[in-house]
Amino acid sequence: MNKLVRQLLDLNELEFGVDRVHPVVFDIDALIKNVVDSSSILVEQNHAEVELADELNDVCNVYADEFMIEQVFTNYFTNALHYCNDGGKVRVWTANKDYDQPRRTEDGLVTGNLRVFVYDEGPNIPDDELDKVFIKFYKVDKARTREYGGSGNGLSIVAASMAAHNKNYGVYNVENGVVFYFDLDIIQQDDGEPEMIPENNADNTSEQ
């Protein structure tokens, strides 16, 4: 119950703007690996095979609220572990796309969009349920939710966190599994002065 109460408090703060976004520069690859490493017991309990893409061995600085993004990735990763088949794979990878025009922030130059993907090898989500899984308390498979002790709030926190960042997130089915994703701004800390556009006019919407 304590976990449920904490999730509800976090969600209410996000929904009502109490917990504002505090963007900082951090290495998203390091964050991902830290979350995966700290989840080793859960990985073992769910007999999952975790695969991290080669690009996660590099440094990729992003500009976002580090605490919120850690929550987002942790929710995606633990959700994937819970719903992958016994002995199934959970795969994490990223893809980036440069913006047509960079934009300057006080911490550096935002140059592109990074999309983080989390795949689990398990049953698909029914197509008519895909747009509902981020709704508070909603669960596709209620019996399975009870088995894992889920409250239905983890993905709602993802939705609220990404909405606070004004960044894309979502889910889609693939053969033999499900992929969740979210987007972040890539930032470079340098002394250059390339052509800039005002931050409120930047096109941060990546292709789906």
Feature map (PLM): residue ranges:
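A conserved beta-strand-to-alpha-helix junction within the catalytic ATP-binding
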Residues: 22-37
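Short conserved segment of the HATPase_c
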Residues: 125-139, 197-198
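Glycine-rich ATP-binding loops of the HATPase_c
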Residues: 166-174
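Conserved micro-motifs of the catalytic ATP-binding
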Residues: 16-21, 59-64
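Short beta-strand/loop element within the Bergerat-fold HATPase_c
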Residues: 87-102, 106-110
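Short helix-loop "hinge" at the ATP-lid/N-box region of the Bergerat-fold HATPase_c
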Residues: 80-81
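Short conserved segments within the C-terminal catalytic ATPase subdomain
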Residues: 42-53
